[in-house]
């Protein structure tokens, strides 16, 4: 009785996957600091400033993606946001990724991407597919999977940084974000 339709099932699973990826990747940027400092000469201040821009853009673009979701559907908003997020990670991987470009990629692009992929848009879409009696359970499942991303991503990132280095780890993140972009079509 929990799932009223196949659309609700698909939306719930897709939203869980989107949030797991989005929040998981976002949570591990601090693990890259030493590598960014040594390889790209990024200072503590520059790294902190980029993360500050990222948080600011996340907050500023959330309502924009919310309006986009209301007008065109949640999948359009989340796909659009994943494009920004993926480009930010990909450009960090390929470069140029020093100076102002570090701020643009790590701060601006990823922050814009988080505005539509992090949790608010996927949860609101899931909420529309469930009746009031089961809505909180469905939204709790999405939140729990986001928390699981917080747990899983640092484990993978530590392993990947030690085995393959920061460049290849960012490349893997780009591929993971592309799978999130595909899953967003079903939200």
Feature names for model-found ranges:
Residues 100-117:
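Hydrophobic core of transmembrane alpha-helices in multi-pass small-molecule transporters
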Residues 10-44, 62-65, 154:
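Extracytoplasmic
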Residues 27, 55-63, 117, 150-151:
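Residue-level signature of mid-helix packing/kink "hotspots" within the transmembrane helices
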Residues 36, 116-130:
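Intracellular juxtamembrane helix-capping segments at the cytosolic ends
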Residues 83-97:
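C-terminal ends and interior cores of transmembrane alpha-helices
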Residues 61-73:
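Helix-to-loop junctions at the C-terminal end of transmembrane segments
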Residues 142-187:
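Helix-loop-helix hairpin linking two adjacent transmembrane segments in secondary transporters
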């Amino acid at each position: 009785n929990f799932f009223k339709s196949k659309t609700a099932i698909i939306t719930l699973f897709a939203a869980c996957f989107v949030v797991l990826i989005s929040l998981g990747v976002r949570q591990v940027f601090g693990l890259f600091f030493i590598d960014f400092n040594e390889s790209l000469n990024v200072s503590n201040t520059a790294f902190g400033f980029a993360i500050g821009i990222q948080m600011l853009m996340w907050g500023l673009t959330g309502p924009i993606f919310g309006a986009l979701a209301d007008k065109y559907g949640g999948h359009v908003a989340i796909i659009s946001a994943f494009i920004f997020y993926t480009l930010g990670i990909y450009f960090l991987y390929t470069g140029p990724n020093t100076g102002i470009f570090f701020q643009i990629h790590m701060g601006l692009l990823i922050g814009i991407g988080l505005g539509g992929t992090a949790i608010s848009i996927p949860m609101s879409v899931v909420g529309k597919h469930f009746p009031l009696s089961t809505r909180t359970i469905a939204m709790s499942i999405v939140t729990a999977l986001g928390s699981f991303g917080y747990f899983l991503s640092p484990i993978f990132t530590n392993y990947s940084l030690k085995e393959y280095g920061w460049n290849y780890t960012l490349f893997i993140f780009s591929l993971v974000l592309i799978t999130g972009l595909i899953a967003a079509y079903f939200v």
